[in-house]
Amino acid sequence: MAFSRLIPATAVGLVLALVRPVAGRSGISGGPRGAPVRAASCAADLDCSLNGVCVGGACRCDPPWTGPVCGVLSYKTTPASGRSLYPESDPRNTWNGAIIRGIDGLYHLFNPIYKPGTLGGTSTMLHGTAASVTGPYQWNTRPNITISEIGAFDGPKSVVYTDPETNSTKYTLWLGGGVYIADSLDGPFTRLEGFKYPGANPAPLWHQGAFYANYGTTIYTTPRLVSGARWTEHGAVSHEGVPANWLPEDPDMWMDKRNNWHIINHAYDNYEWQHCATSVLSSHFFSQDGKTWHFLPQAVQPYSHTVQYDDGTTHMFVTLERPNMFFDETGLLTHIHLAADLVTGDEGCGNRTNHSHYGHVPCDNCKYEDHGGTTIIALGL
């Protein structure tokens, strides 16, 4: 999706963003749809994060992107059901999953379930369905899916693609180092034996008949999902300009309507343990060919901590990780769904002892002792 992730696993995608004050810069809010936002000098579309075009020296952003350099995802009020897509009354943890819109018109969420106090080590993936991407999801209408045990932070992501030999639609879930394939969202999902993707925590993409994945700072490609498939290097993601102490992880990769490539990440700073509402949260890299990648010196963060809901409440998430963009069936980016710490707020958890760095537990590590969940945010269009 991205029209090429093609509907990465769903025919859907999503996004969001924020400009964090860095080195004396102040946050900037978005303007009218499709209109330049505040005077900002640009000479080329690259200066607009490839999320818009440079017109008359100013960036004209594609919704839901906004800001002077089109680097921030605009949020809108999200249905309250989106705060936690799996019931918070269950003490077990989820940590985001894959959402795919089916031909039945339902949204299918595939989410591994972890024991209380853990974010890894399971062989059970739940299958929930909803009439709206923001839920509420029903978790008792589809059987659980048995998977090979996965560790922490290794999927699932999804890709929907067309098999060139049969011209049939294939649904795939990427997790635990392997790929599970089905002809229907109701399964059965069968692991492709003898196939592995590079590294862990995949960011798969299907484009022009080939598969791509991001691991670390490398983009890999393979022509087919077959046993014994070999991955070759396609490009390198430069981290030049990324501020000191920023650590990008959890990539999600897609292509936009202009065939530009994008990667959005959760990012964090292990020195930040107070005032978590302004802590580092996300990053964005972009490319015109998937080989040469860019990061703007403004250090714009695409998504932010605080979400407003239609029941009048607001929630500040201490961390939002494992971002997945959700695109609708027309290829429009409408939502972003993420793994979320559902408990701790701006106060952080610096005085805890487990998972500490430099004498304190940083904002993003509160999750290890809190309730982990899956949340979704509606983007402004």
What annotation goes with each model-predicted range?
Residues 25-381:
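Carbohydrate-active catalytic/glycan-binding domains of CAZyme proteins
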Residues 5-21:
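Cleavable N-terminal signal peptides of Sec/SRP-targeted secreted and luminal proteins
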